Amino acid sequence: ARQGDMTQYGGSIVQGSAGVRIGAPTGVACSVCPGGVTSGHPVNPLLGAKVLPGETDIALPGPLPFILSRTYSSYRTKTPAPVGSLGPGWKMPADIRLQLRDNTLILSDNGGRSLYFEHLFPGEDGYSRSESLWLVRGGVAKLDEGHRLAALWQALPEELRLSPHRYLATNSPQGPWWLLGWCERVPEADEVLPAPLPPYRVLTGLVDRFGRTQTFHREAAGEFSGEITGVTDGAGRHFRLVLTTQAQRAEEARQQAISGGTEPSAFPDTLPGYTEYGRDNGIRLSAVWLTHDPEYPENLPAAPLVRYGWTPRGELAAVYDRSNTQVRSFTYDDKYRGRMVAHRHTGRPEIRYRYDSDGRVTEQLNPAGLSYTYQYEKDRITITDSLDRREVLHTQGEAGLKRVVKKE
């Protein structure tokens, strides 16, 4: 979604970025900067949310490359999606999901945004004017010659075009396609076969207009069933995503304490199954390795491209680059899991945040620059910086549909 786009109900899109849409090669719309309004380092005053619009951890050059980026928002939607592998509040582009209802298709990202389409028959397509997005159901070898996507459709492998159980999304006749399928799984011993397909579709890959593919590999069985554990990009490189459970992280923390001769800190073996940011299975991404590169098969990195550290409550605490140097750190509220109260780039001052009882940011503290305070009234938000300069935003709408109609 782009800021300012209109929905089918007449309101503007408020959870999106200025140029990134669902279907863009760099990821799903960021969902953390409604209306494009941010303040400071940064805060979205319309939602009263601490946001980080996008930080890229992996981006190697090449056709249809695998780009691993993170976005954060402290905003809590009324219909939260499950907590992803980066912990509460954080999102990755691959967390897109299509729900199949009786008469409705709901395309959702991990931030709780939803885009509704009518039921599609095989070979039919739906178009969202607000997103400039097509959703097409497979089941035909060719689209009508006059269709804007006819040429792009032919770039798909025949098995994808002919499968009525797959859906494909794109925001441009130039591509790429986002492939929405299902995770193959190992059936239970007493399960009646063939097992029915799930009532949802998840992102399984991308295909560009030249037929190059990026594939997301999901586990078929075990404790990580359905989770992405590998990616093959358009250059043929393979990345391995190392996942951990809360119990595994707790055991690792105990072993580190023993080897270091220190008293083990409180690190529970399980996490609550639900947070303000949605259901939580406790599975987290620990590291990403490059395991195959056709251009340099004998010269693979001896360390992960990125590594993540976690708090005992399953919150993203630190990011380490390929040299094992910590580049980011995050601190969260003791009471509200996933609510960020501070963050820091290595070598820079720590930026801190305070919230009110409704979970809205009221103060942003920067020891080496401008600090900000936020005052929330009905249809009015006042932002004051540490030089006593003031900006007043007059708004309309509520919650995620709030938009600025006048500035002072």
Q: What residue spans do the PLM features occupy?
A:
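Solvent-exposed loop and beta-edge segments used for protein-protein assembly and interaction
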Residues: 60-62, 99-101, 163
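Residue-level recognition of conserved structural "scaffold" positions that shape functional pockets
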Residues: 17, 42, 55, 61, ...
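Short alpha-helical segments and helix-capping/turn motifs at coil-helix boundaries
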Residues: 50-55, 91-93, 99-103
